[in-house]
Regions:
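Active-site nucleotide/adenylate-binding loops and adjacent lid/helix of ATP-dependent enzymes
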Residues: 2-8, 75-76, 86-181, 230, ...
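Conserved N-proximal alpha/beta basic substrate-recognition cap immediately N-terminal to
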Residues: 10-113
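A short glycine-rich, hydrophobically flanked beta-strand micro-motif that places a catalytic Asp/Glu
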Residues: 38-40, 172, 245-256
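Short glycine-rich anion-binding loops that position phosphate/pyrophosphate groups of nucleotides
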Residues: 58-60, 139-140, 267
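Protein kinase-like catalytic core scaffold
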Residues: 133, 191-192, 248, 260-263
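Phosphate-binding site of ATP-dependent enzymes
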Residues: 144-240
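C-terminal active-site "lid" helix and adjoining low-complexity regulatory extension at the edge
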Residues: 227, 241, 254-292
Length: 292
């Protein structure tokens, strides 16, 4: 029997779909004979009492979740997400460098530094990547700090704003598609496969409503992992192999039958009725990994 702590924040229970998924994890763990306790930040001193830690709160090197991950890792516990995965996936510049180094097929990407905000560099980028381009700050999540620009003035404005957060930005070719593939990977095996649809009139799965602080999200369609294209799964696994053996969500675009990686995310979303819809065993597989 394993003692599993699931680190969460209050907001993890605000969405009924995520709340049901968390309850599914607890139910499956109990069915397998393990304990599964929800741990909030005030309880992190209890980490040494557990055999494994499963993080569902948003991960970031500056957040409490990272402290939890690093503490559990240093104690020798099984942990999802491990601190190295959080560091790599949380820094898009590092991630794209690894893609280039290990020949992972990915969206064409260039880097922009603070001293390159000038006309000549903008022209070079547009000539290499086309118009429009997508600008990303290194530390992004939930489609935030990701914007599309098609002219030099917009490019300059967005870059200056993002440079308040970072010394380096990623700039990518814009590849419009009706959906992005999301492949969930655990311990170098495909866990689930989904299509994240792009909302009508938008260009990414999660977009901010005009003039409002809220986001609009596209629909999610789940596939049985065995029915997903082999080349898609191979691409996802190759991208994860350079990071580690943890739990990842790989975003992939399909262009003319070929697959290119957008990014790899640690702490991927798992909502009841969405990612699990065609692959109900994902809960058991994650629990088994933690308890092993």
């Amino acid at each position: 029997m394993a003692r599993i702590a699931c680190f969460v924040e209050r907001y993890n229970f605000s969405d009924p779909k995520e709340s049901r998924a968390l309850e599914n994890f607890r139910r499956v763990a109990h069915e397998k004979g393990h304990t599964f306790d929800f741990m909030f930040r005030e309880g992190i001193s209890e980490i040494p009492k557990y055999d494994a830690v499963f993080i569902r709160a948003t991960t970031d090197p500056l957040f409490t979740a990272y402290v939890v991950s690093k503490t559990a890792w240093e104690l020798g516990l099984k942990v999802i997400d491990d601190p190295e995965s959080i560091q790599i996936c949380g820094n898009k510049i590092h991630l794209y460098d690894l893609f280039k180094k290990y020949d992972v097929p990915h969206i064409p990407t260039l880097f922009l530094s603070k001293d390159e905000i000038h006309h000549k560099r903008f022209l070079e980028i547009f000539e290499n990547l086309g118009k429009p381009v997508v600008i990303k700050a290194p530390y992004t999540s939930f489609s935030r700090y990701v914007e599309k620009v098609a002219c030099e003035s917009s490019f300059r404005d967005v870059a200056k704003r993002y440079f308040r957060k970072s010394d380096l930005l990623a700039v990518q070719t814009f590849m419009p598609t009706a959906f992005d593939w999301r492949v969930g990977v655990l311990n170098r095996q495909v866990l689930y496969v989904c299509k994240y649809m792009i909302p009508k009139g938008r260009w990414k799965h999660g977009c901010k409503r005009r003039g409002k602080p809220t986001f609009i999200w596209g629909r999610t369609f789940s596939l049985r992992r065995e029915n997903a294209p082999l080349a898609l799964k191979e691409t996802a696994l190759k991208a994860c192999d350079i990071i580690g053996k943890g739990l990842y969500g790989v975003d992939i675009k399909e262009i003319d039958g070929k697959y290119v990686v957008v990014e790899v995310n640690d702490n991927p979303s798992i909502y009841a009725g969405y990612e699990d819809y065609r692959n109900r065993d994902l809960y058991g597989k994650i629990i088994d990994y933690l308890a092993d």
